Amino acid sequence: MFLGLFQYTIDTVVKDVSKSVNLSLDAVQELELNVVPIRQASNVTGFLFTSVFVYFFALFKASSLRRNYIMLAARFAVVFLYCPLLYYCGALLDATIICCALIGRLCLVCFYSWRYKNALFIIFNTTTLSFLNGKAAYYDGKSIVILEGGDHYITFGNSFVAFVSNIDLYLAIRGRQEADLHLLRTVELLDGKKLYVFSQHQIVGITNAAFDSIQLDEYATISE
């Protein structure tokens, strides 16, 4: 099963048993008819396991740059070491599915890497990235991005991005989506931290929602 979820299953067992006990042709055919349900269940199970493995492994995005490097090396190891081993052992279908899925995903991210002349698309294994002063991070597709930070720095992904002035500060979205999210507001919190609000849409109003700090006038009356 380790060297092929599709082909190294019941068929291999039937052939090995037939050769070892020297079964006649009629006995082999009868044995194959008896194991048809098991063969079908095994093939379906193998297909599901392989599909889940390929989908997860090809699209997985790590949470840090170092882990992304490890995952990239693992994908190359699967393509250049594991898949040839599958071909050598006769698991042609498994090797073809895994190899095509990983190479197809790699070609897709390589296209965006070539288009924007940036290898981070390949390392992050994504078709869309957000850039802030040369640093890159994943982009979730939202039109409003709120980042934490402080005076003259922003926490961007796993990096700290320092800046002198926030006048020209913006998020550059590149890849499958292209947009420039400009810095619209900077919100200073009581603990000294700041929230930086980036968006393409203009802010038309801000409402303070700290209701527990609002004092009501006991003598206020309602006039009709």
Swiss-Prot record:
Residues 128-203 form the CoV 3a-like viroporin CD domain. Residues 34-124 form the CoV 3a-like viroporin TM domain. It is found in: Host membrane. The chain crosses the membrane at residues 40-60, 69-88, 95-111. GO terms for cellular component: host cell membrane; membrane. It comes from Porcine epidemic diarrhea virus (strain CV777) (PEDV). Its main location: host cell. It is a multi-pass membrane protein. Keywords: Host membrane, Membrane, Transmembrane, Transmembrane helix. This is Non-structural protein 3.
